[in-house]
């Protein structure tokens, strides 16, 4: 995915004095994403994102998977490629079009060997027409099937498929900076934009959090290195203990 990516989420909500997970207090909106795209410096692409697990049906076939509402920019940011049909166009977002782009796993489970393009499946009770099929990506480094998903326009998700108590909100905003060098300044600019838009005072806490993918990757690498050293130490101790045990048995013999 590259290391010039930022992920912006709503900050944690508090329930009964207990701090919940990030994104539990919806504060980010589609308008926030538009403002970042229009005014933030050093930004190449911006993609609002929201998702739910939904039941898909086509004829007698059904499949449960993640359905994400977003824009064509998300496919660009996350390196998804449409190999048959087309991607989203601005009119799909503007008109809340009931269209979908699907991964290969979903295509196989619902349509078998048939070409899914122009077929109509149901997401819950909402009929949507398949306009695009994604190139196979296989499993991620964490073992997740990257082909088991459906993309629909963000506005369609908000207004016609998901339903929400917080109209216009999104779970996440993904941002791709123009380069790794531009990442830090873009992050600062986005931070200022969101604080202004959300009318957060100087003494008030942020109601959002920005995660730098480069920093996250370094944290993962550091954790993996620490775990490797720990496992090595455990193995060494096990060998030492085993060796002492064998030596004691030989001495007794």
Residue ranges and their predicted role:
Residues 1-66, 73, 108-109, 181, ...:
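Hydrophobic, regular-secondary-structure patches
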Residues 3-5, 23, 31, 41, ...:
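Extracytoplasmic
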Residues 73-88, 97-201:
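Mid-to-C-terminal secondary-structure elements
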Residues 32-35, 106, 153, 169, ...:
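Hydrophobic alpha-helical segments typical of transmembrane helices
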């Amino acid at each position: 995915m590259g290391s010039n990516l930022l992920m912006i989420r709503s900050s944690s909500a508090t329930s009964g004095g207990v701090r919940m997970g990030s994104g539990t207090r919806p504060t980010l909106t589609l308008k926030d994403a538009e403002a970042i795209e229009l005014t933030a410096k050093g930004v190449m692409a911006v993609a609002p994102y929201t998702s739910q697990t939904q039941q898909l049906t086509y004829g007698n076939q059904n499949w449960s998977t993640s359905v994400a509402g977003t824009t064509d920019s998300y496919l660009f940011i996350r390196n998804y490629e449409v190999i048959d049909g087309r991607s989203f166009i601005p009119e799909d977002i503007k008109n809340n079009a009931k269209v979908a782009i699907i991964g290969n796993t979903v295509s196989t489970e619902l349509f078998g060997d048939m070409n899914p393009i122009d077929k109509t499946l149901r997401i819950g009770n909402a009929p949507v027409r398949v306009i695009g099929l994604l190139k196979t990506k296989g499993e991620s480094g964490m073992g997740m099937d990257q082909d088991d998903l459906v993309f629909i326009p963000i506005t369609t998700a908000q207004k016609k498929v998901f339903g929400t108590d917080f109209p216009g909100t999104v779970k996440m905003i993904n941002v791709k900076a123009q380069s790794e060098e531009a990442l830090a300044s873009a992050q600062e600019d986005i931070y200022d934009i969101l604080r202004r838009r959300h009318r957060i005072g100087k003494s008030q806490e942020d109601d959002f959090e920005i995660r730098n993918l480069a920093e996250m990757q370094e944290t993962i690498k550091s954790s993996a290195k620490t775990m490797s050293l720990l496992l090595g130490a455990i193995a060494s101790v096990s060998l030492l203990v085993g060796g002492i045990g064998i030596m004691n048995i030989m001495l007794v013999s």
